[in-house]
Structures are given as structure tokens and as C-alpha cells.
């Protein structure tokens, strides 16, 4: 009887340990969220203004995902350009569009410089639509169907709860772009941190494109976080990369986005001790609080090594 009790105790401990391992990444994400919300309480940061998704890629064949409000639909700003990059590479691979010097230049400027004008050109090419004056209802319906090509592509891959069919602008949309967006912005681009982190993970692991196109995308997303840029909104040094200050040996690939009301980043990080993870952090109504995103990243950097 005693041996049976001992065996039962060992099994219980083993099961409990397994459960703890399964939830530890989620606990890290919860801790990152709570720590950041508490730190920025004086700035009135609330739960509803923060979304986080973390994907542990130490075993790329078995990625583990945890999130905090990861399925909330949020205006993504320039993070949407990551989706247009992937769509363009897929279209090129499938020979739906042609590689031209202008498209090559635009894809580079869209990701490296986060150029809105380059993005507008890329959207024209991959959806076969153009901006301009308002169209009659029937023509507008046909135009909108074409513009939804990127949505249909990602839906075919199982992406849900997102909308990617709008150009990015420095100021505002006019004509058919404004009509498409809707009078109350109901058709604006929307992403979740879950979908965004998944996409970067699929780029990194080579699941979304062939090796040559994967290498091309990774090259465009590679960031220098050394702080040499004087731009506080530099994609390498002004977002997740801020968390690397005082740390050595890290590598960073990312796509950031920001407006007057939003500040986001999705980053793939490789640590000196072999850690690999994707971290997507979206914030709303705190675009001037540049430390929120690196605050989340620091907690993850400090805790990811302890996740089993």
C-alpha cells in the first residue's frame, strides 16, 4: 500500500511538473504584461491598450505560443507591410506578377524605410487596383473584390480575425480609397498580435516561401539595434531593440509601425545562449510612450531562458 501511495505521489508530481512546463510560457507573457502595466500606471496604461504574443522557437519544429489579448483586432499601422511583403513574394513565386526594378525598389523601401508611398505601389501591383476618383457602385464592387486578394490569400492559410486591404498614407485617403475604408473606418486594416507573430514565425522558419525568398525577406527585416541612429522611431533602435541596451550578442529582425495613437512592433530575436523567439507587442493610445514595447521585451529576455 505504501509503495502504491509513493508511486501515486510520484505520478502526481510528474503530471504537475508537466502542466507547469506547458503553462510557463503563458506565465511569462502574463508577467510581462502585468509588469509593464504596473510600471506605466502613472501614464494610465490599461490592459485594453496592450496586446502581446510570444512564440518560443527554440525547437522550430514545435513552436510554442502564448499571448495576452492576442486575438484583439487593432489598427496595425505599418506592421501591415509585413503582410504585403509576404503576399508579393508569394505572387512572384507563383508568377502572378513580374519582378521589375521598381517592384524590387518598392519592396525594399516599404520594409527597410517603412515608406508609405512604396507600400501604395506594392498594393497596386499585387491587387491590380489603383487609387483615384470615386467609381460607380458596380465598378467599385469589382475594385474592392480585387483589393481583397490579400485577405483571401491569408484566409486560405487559416488566418482569422484580420483585415488587410488598405494602403498606408502619411495623411489621409481620398476618392475610392476613402470609399473603400468606409465612412467610419469600418474597413480599415486590422491585425492581431497572434496573426502577426504567426506570420513572422512562418517567414523565419521558411514555411511561407521558398529558401531564396525567405532569405530575401529576412535580409529586409534585419535590424541594427546598436543605437547609432538619431531617429527615436528607428525600427532597430527605437522599439524592441531598446531592450538590448547594455546587452551583447543578440540578433534582431523586425517590422515596426506607429501613428499618433498606436505604437507596435513584431520582432524575431536570437539570444547569445541559443534562444529564439518571436515577440509581437501592440499598444494603443500611448504612441509617445516609447518604453512600453522594450519594457515587455526586457521581461521576456530575462525570463525566456527559464521556460522549459
Regions found by a protein language model. Give the residues of each.
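Short glycine/serine- and small hydrophobic-enriched flexible loop segments
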Residues: 86-94, 124, 198-205, 302
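Active-site-adjacent helix/loop patches that line small-molecule binding or acyl-intermediate pockets
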Residues: 24-35, 47, 102-181, 189-194
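Structural recognition of the beta-strand scaffold that forms the well-ordered cores
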Residues: 51-54, 77, 109, 121, ...
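Structured C-terminal helix/loop/strand segments within mature extracytoplasmic catalytic/sensor domains
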Residues: 21-36, 44-49, 188, 192, ...
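Solvent-exposed loop/turn segments at secondary-structure junctions
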Residues: 58-60, 73-75, 116-118, 128-129, ...
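N-terminal leader/targeting segments and the immediately adjacent pre-domain N-terminus
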Residues: 3-69, 92-97, 140, 144, ...
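Active-site SXXK
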Residues: 75-97, 110, 279
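Short, well-structured active-site flanking segments
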Residues: 90-108, 119, 210-214
Amino acid at each position: 500500500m505504501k509503495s502504491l501511495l509513493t508511486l501515486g505521489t510520484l505520478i502526481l508530481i510528474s503530471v504537475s511538473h508537466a502542466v507547469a512546463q506547458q503553462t510557463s510560457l503563458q506565465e511569462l507573457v502574463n508577467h510581462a504584461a502585468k509588469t509593464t502595466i504596473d510600471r506605466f500606471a502613472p501614464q494610465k496604461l490599461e490592459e485594453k491598450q496592450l496586446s502581446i504574443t510570444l512564440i518560443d522557437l527554440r525547437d522550430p519544429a514545435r513552436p510554442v505560443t502564448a499571448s495576452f489579448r492576442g486575438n484583439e483586432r487593432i489598427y496595425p499601422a505599418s506592421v501591415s507591410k509585413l503582410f504585403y511583403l509576404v503576399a508579393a513574394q508569394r505572387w512572384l513565386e507563383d508568377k502572378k506578377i513580374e519582378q521589375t526594378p521598381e517592384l524590387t525598389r518598392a519592396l525594399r523601401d516599404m520594409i527597410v524605410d517603412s515608406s508609405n508611398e512604396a507600400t501604395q505601389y506594392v498594393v497596386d501591383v499585387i491587387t491590380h487596383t489603383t487609387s483615384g476618383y470615386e467609381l460607380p457602385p458596380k465598378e467599385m464592387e469589382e475594385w474592392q473584390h480585387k483589393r481583397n486578394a490579400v485577405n483571401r490569400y491569408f484566409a486560405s492559410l487559416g488566418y482569422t480575425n484580420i483585415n488587410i486591404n488598405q494602403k498606408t498614407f502619411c495623411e489621409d485617403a481620398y476618392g475610392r480609397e476613402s470609399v473603400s475604408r468606409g465612412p467610419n473606418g469600418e474597413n480599415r486594416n486590422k491585425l492581431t498580435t497572434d496573426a502577426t507573430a504567426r506570420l513572422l514565425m512562418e517567414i523565419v522558419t521558411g514555411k511561407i516561401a521558398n529558401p531564396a525568398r525567405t532569405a530575401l525577406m529576412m535580409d529586409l527585416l534585419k535590424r541594427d539595434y546598436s543605437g547609432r541612429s538619431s531617429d527615436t522611431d528607428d525600427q532597430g533602435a527605437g522599439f524592441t531593440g531598446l531592450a538590448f541596451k547594455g546587452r551583447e550578442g543578440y540578433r534582431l529582425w523586425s517590422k515596426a509601425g506607429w501613428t499618433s495613437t498606436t505604437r507596435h512592433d513584431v520582432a524575431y530575436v536570437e539570444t547569445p545562449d541559443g534562444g529564439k523567439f518571436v515577440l509581437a507587442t501592440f499598444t494603443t493610445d500611448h504612441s509617445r510612450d516609447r518604453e512600453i514595447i522594450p519594457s515587455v521585451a526586457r521581461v521576456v529576455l530575462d525570463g525566456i531562458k527559464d521556460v522549459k
